[in-house]
Every structure is written in structure tokens, then in C-alpha cells.
Amino acid sequence: MLFVGLLVVGVVVGFISGFFGIGGGTVVVPVMILFGYDIKYAIGVSIMQMIFSSVFGSFVNFKSKMLDIKPALILGFGGFCGALTSGFIVSYFSSKFLLGVLILVQIINLIKLFKTPAEPVGEANGSKILLFLVGLVVGAVAISVGIGGSVLVIPILISFLNYDIKRAVGTGLFFVVFSSTAGFLSLAAHELVHYDVGIMLGLGSLIGVYFGVKTSHKISKTAQKRWMVALISTILMITARKFLLS
């Protein structure tokens, strides 16, 4: 029964990952806690699942010409470096402190994203140093609380670096490939991963992410931005509730 439940969760999370360009940890971690897992092990499982969905989803985006490899690689390398510190951060800082940092970043992103038009004006900021630094900071913070980081990266790309939303979503999902791989290695070294559960979730996510990516390609930029604002608002409320109850 647990096996079927994990596969279903994986499919749902995969669709969300592909549609929004996120890792899916914001869904997986609460569900794993509901299944009785400690939050630190829930984070480990969440990160492992992200590897499956982000790699396959990025492949689909690339084949559909919705992914610019060069800037995404720079951003991803920064995320990889930042995420390597996640094992230390999770072990050293309290969960409440990490949630507080995440809430602050989400509030800033949401306000800025809400004010930014769906269609960008002018060229995107392609600064390699800036992309690397964004990846570095987001990778360190996000993986430490069990999310891939693109839910933070995408609003930054849209609102601060003037990215087109569809380009930002493709870049965000590719970012998760790097951050989740580094986070997985770091958390595995600290023995915080249940491999069997992560594999079951990952297999389910392969199905969902394909349909999520294809759906995101078909909807308008305005509609996609509205869905993104709704997603971040929901995540913010869930995170704030968790912070207040912790």
C-alpha cells in the first residue's frame, strides 16, 4: 500500500515539477512527515526524488528548445557549490532558523514578482558572476530545507534579472539537477537518505514531469505567471504555519 501511495505522490509531484520548473520538495517534505518520517529524513527523500524529475524534465525542455544551456550551467554550478554545504547547515542550524530565512526570501520574491510584468521589457541580465552568486546562495539555503531551490531562483530570474517566464521555468528546473545532486551527496554522507523510498518517488515523478513540462509549454505567459504567484503564496502560507507551530 505504501508503495502505491509513494508512486502516486511521485506522479503528482513530477507534474508540479515540470509545470512550475521546481523540484517538488515543498510537496514531498510535508507528505513524508505525514507518513511519519522525521523532517531531516523527509528532506533526504525529497532531494533524491528531485534528481529523477529534474534530469528528465530538463531533457524534455531541451528537446523542446525551452532551455538555454550556457546561463543555466553557470547558475547550476553555483547551486551545486552552495548545496554541498547543506549537510553541514542542516546539522548545525535549527529547523526554525532555516524556515525563517526561507520565509524572508519568499516574501521578497513574491512582492517583486507580483509587480513584474509577464512579458519582460529589454534584455535579460546575463552576468555570469551574478548568476553564479544567485545559484550559490539559493543552493545553500534551499537544499537545507528540502527544496530544490527553483521556487526561489525563478522569481529572482524573472523579477531581478528580467528573464522571460518560460525561459526562467526551464532554467529553474535545470538548476535543480545541480542543487539536488549536490544536496543528495551531502545528505547521504550524513546518512539522512532512505534510498528505497526515494527511488519509488523518483520513478513516479518521471511520468508526471513529462506531462507537466508539456502543459507548461502550451499555456500563456500571463497565465503561467498567475499560477506561479499562486504557488509561491501557498508555499509561503504553509511555511509560515510550520514556522509558527515549530
Show the residue positions of the predicted features.
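Extracytoplasmic gate region of multi-pass secondary transporters
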Residues: 150-151
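Membrane-embedded alpha-helical segments of transport systems
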Residues: 48-56, 81-82, 89, 175-182
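Juxtamembrane transmembrane-helix boundary motif
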Residues: 1-15, 27, 31-35, 39, ...
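Short, conserved catalytic or interaction motifs in soluble domains
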Residues: 24
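Short hydrophobic/aromatic, small-residue-rich stretches within specific transmembrane helices
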Residues: 46-50, 76, 172-176, 197-202
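Small-residue hotspots at the loop-to-helix junctions and early N-terminal turns
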Residues: 39-44, 169, 173
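Hydrophobic alpha-helical transmembrane segments of multi-pass integral membrane proteins
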Residues: 111, 167-183
